[in-house]
Amino acid sequence: MRTRVAELLGAEFPICAFSHCRDVVAAVSNAGGFGILGAVAHSPKRLESELTWIEEHTGGKPYGVDVLLPPKYIGAEQGGIDAQQARELIPEGHRTFVDDLLVRYGIPAVTDRQRSSSAGGLHISPKGYQPLLDVAFAHDIRLIASALGPPPPDLVERAHNHDVLVAALAGTAQHARRHAAAGVDLIVAQGTEAGGHTGEVATMVLVPEVVDAVSPTPVLAAGGIARGRQIAAALALGAEGVWCGSVWLTTEEAETPPVVKDKFLAATSSDTVRSRSLTGKPARMLRTAWTDEWDRPDSPDPLGMPLQSALVSDPQLRINQAAGQPGAKARELATYFVGQVVGSLDRVRSARSVVLDMVEEFIDTVGQLQGLVQR
């Protein structure tokens, strides 16, 4: 599976694994793939610790870091707002809605210690993500990825000065062209099937459109990819690698809350929904009572980023804490970002096994396809 992407990344396989869990990142890189740590909610101190740990456990294997750089968000015109400012901008009606929701589902309050351990928020403004970039570039990362918008020129220049590749996620060919114009090295064409922030165009349609739009810039396919057959399809569409996220959420290494992991394992591909209820921007997640409550006609519209995250971060902590108790009604609310491929996630495996199974099925699939054209 030697492609330009594999060569650029220095990985054996062009399989990129996006995860917020350092253990998954390290395991995938050690298995020949390319682990990418999602750092948007990390403090600089925590990111320093996580990257140090990854490097100690990968023996020089390549890995990357993903940050969230949206061009539009509340407070962007003033260079961003901090967590306290975001909380002060939350309308009282939204607070009341969430408080009532938690009461109806029997969610207890968290302790101050639990709340402080989860503090952080989304670092999406320059003053929020620059300290994270300082930490990242002080380590031996191979790639920095930008989600929700073209990377700023200073980021591209800084990355290239450190011999670090720049990737950016795109949900349309138009987005991809803007990324290419910004000087990125890799473009991730992410279809609507994907978990997390997505657009409305399906992977099968999007990938060839993006490949044609940005050639010769290499493209990775994302959205609905968890098996070797899907990797073969992605490469047939013109991609030179894949970007996967959902498939790692049910691995042994994943930090996914047990209740949510069980829900993923039982879900079908029809059990996800694009909702603004967690971040304020459309993101695909598991459909649960949480998303249904926000979709009710009498519910308030979710707030823009980062206010929605500021509103629901503490309630989400409380829900996950309560959902672990047997028979808790909180289990109905528990959700997390995941793509439609969740319907294929039916057992817990190690991240290494996932990578090797992908490669084996890819080889078998390509062999079968070659047989179709032999005369």
Curated annotation (Swiss-Prot):
This is Putative monooxygenase Rv1533. InterPro entries: Aldolase_TIM, NMO. Pfam families: NMO. Keywords: Flavoprotein, FMN, Monooxygenase, Oxidoreductase. CDD domains: NPD_like. GO terms for molecular function: nitronate monooxygenase activity. Binds 1 FMN per subunit. Its EC number is 1.13.12.-. Its cofactor is FMN. The keyword Flavoprotein applies. The keyword Flavoprotein applies. It comes from the Bacteria. Belongs to the nitronate monooxygenase family. FMN binds at Q190, G195, G224, W243, C244, G245, S246.
